[in-house]
Every structure is written in C-alpha cells, then in structure tokens.
Amino acid sequence: MVPSPLSELLECAHVVSLALTTPFRGLTQREAIIFDSPRGPSEWSPFVEYDDAEASLWLASAIEDCWHDSTLPEPPASIRVNGTIPAVSPQEATTLITKAGFPHTVKVKVGGPTSSLTEDHARVQAVRAALGPTGRIRLDANGAWALDEAEHAIRLMEHCDIDYVEQPVESLADMAVLRTRMAEIGIGLAADESIRRWADLDAVIAQGAADIVVIKVQPLGGLRRAHDTIKKAHAAGLQVVISSALETSVGIYHAATLQGFLESQNPHALDAGLGTVSFLGDDIVESPLRAHGGKLSVTKPRLDQGALTRLRASKDREQWWRARLERCFALL
C-alpha cells in the first residue's frame, strides 16, 4: 500500500472525543481521528493503550478506506446486526433490549472486574426472558475468565440457550482445551482478541481453538485484509462474525460493506456486531447508523461539520493524537 502523504492526512484530520452512554470496557469517552478526505470520510480510532505497531494497522485501514479503490461493492440498504448488552443490571438489560426494538440476536457482556458471576448469570437470564425462546444469545467475556472458571460459568448459563461464547479465556491453548470440554453441550467458542493481525488466524486454526472468528476491519489493516482473513477462515471450516471496534458511524459504514458482501454470498451469514453506535452519546455524521430491531439501515456517511466542531477534543488530546499519527505513519 502506498499511503497518502502525511501532510495530506494531517490537513484533513479532526480529533474528536465522544461521550459513551454506558461505560464500555472501562471507557467513558471514545476518541478518534476522522479524516475528511475528498473521496469521503474515514476513521482512525485505535484504543489509547495500543502501541504504535498495532495502531499503525488501524491507520492502514483508514488510509485504504478513502485513498484506495475498494474491491467490494457498496453495502446494501440494510444489514442484520445483534444488539449488545454491556455489564449492567438485569433491569437495565431489559430496558436496553426494549429500546433496541427486540433484536433477534443479542450479545451479552460477561466477566471482568466490574461484574460477578452471579450478576452475569442474572443479566443473561434477563436477556433470555426479554427475547423469549426464539431469540439468540451470544456471550462475550473479553478473555476475562481463567480456564476452569470459564467452564463453570458457561455450564451455569447453558440453560439460557447460548449460541456461542466470545473469547472466554485469553490464551489460545486454554481456548482449545475449553472448546473440547464444551463440545458435548454444543456451545461454540469465538476468537476475538486472539485475531489482531492477519497471521493470527493461522494459530487459531492450528490449535483448533475456535468455531467462529470475529473480524474487525480496522485492527486487521483494512477491508482487503479482512476479506482475505474471511476467505482463509471459511476454507478452514470456521464461521465469521463482522464486528465493530466501538467506532463512529464512519467506521461502522466501512465494516457494513464487508457484512453486506457476506450476506450477498450467504443468506445465513451470522448477524454482525455492528449495532454499537447506540453506545455513543453523539456522532459526527448527519445520519448516524443506529440499529433498531436487529436491522441497521446503511447510508453513506456525510460529516456533520457542526458536530466535528462541537466534539473536538481538548488541545492536549489533539496534540497527543497528531503525534501518534506521525509515529504510526512512519511505520507503514
């Protein structure tokens, strides 16, 4: 990839900070650089704790989105998405599902330092009660559990009819062991944090660590690499789920392109995890891509110039992001 000159990136970069409606992975603000390029907007939003090597892959994705022609068709008018329930009380979980229009599929956050197993179980039970018997439930532990702890938790919640558990443990070796243990009850495992680079999938396949892989466009370096990763996963007999990295509508749009392609190839493609704009208290486009009832209407993003001004990050954060951009650009 031959990236656009750094000066051009800096000239069209807007550093923004968006408040979250609910704390997510310990965050209360989501920071990003939005590039207002002549060919349309793109987003660069690696989490602040990521090192420059990892963040540079996200930058490659942002550059690809607006400075290189896509090999994929434009996304369809709508795509299927799951709802997402963060680590909230059962009552709040029920309220969120109602506000989301009762999506057919819901991902429930479990594990982590802010929620006990008892609280996790109660949350999942509330989601099952709200969805009824035909709704589909996914769990996402973000690698928070130890091996035996994960097995105990999954067996405890088995009665809630769980489709699969996303990254229940951190290491691939433990994922492989847990997958063998879970085979008897028919609950699959999905690799998310384990897939951060294109080559990571090779280790997942070699160790038999997952049934499903979670694909996020920015961390993999763009749509081309994400598409190649999907083809490799399918060749190995794995299913894929397209998911967000808690992006604005700009990032969600580019990921929706990939989901739309999957749905065009397979009408039974798994619902995407792209309905996360609802966790942002504001957005930087004229028509935010907010899901309802398990559907996400997809419109090409048009930046809201007033929002870019209103949501502009503080001077010190802007300087931090621009310095990060220069460092990461040098690694491309």
Each PLM stretch: what is its role?
Residues 26-27, 44-46, 54-55, 93-95:
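Short, glycine/acidic-enriched capping/hinge loops at junctions between secondary-structure elements
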Residues 51-60:
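A short, polar/charged loop-to-alpha-helix boundary motif
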Residues 113-254, 280-285, 289-291:
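Catalytic core of soluble alpha/beta enzymes
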